[in-house]
Amino acid sequence: LERGTPPHAKIIASSGGHTDNYVLVCEEVLYAFPGMTGTYDHRIRADMVYFTSSNNGAVFSSGSIAFGQALPSHGFNNNVSKLLANLVDAFSKDGPLPGGKWVSEEKQWR
């Protein structure tokens, strides 16, 4: 919430259990020290986040840079492609999307 995420945002999936091959991005590091790798630092993860907005809008965000590269795996017959197909199908329908209700006071996110 401290960086502008609306209060009704839902984390619908999160990665975890990363090895020490995964490290924080350089933007998150002020000073490098031991323990900033996947088995030690809880910040090393990718979250999928969903929230609704005004006028029946919504936002889906994948926290992984590899999300797009996973789509063509196995000829697009995989769980990431199915997830995206379900999202596009839901977002293309008329009417409200499922999820937490957006209220006008939340436009003051900061």
Task: Describe the role of every protein-language-model region.
Residues 1-110:
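Extracellular ligand-binding/catalytic regions of CAZymes and related secreted enzymes
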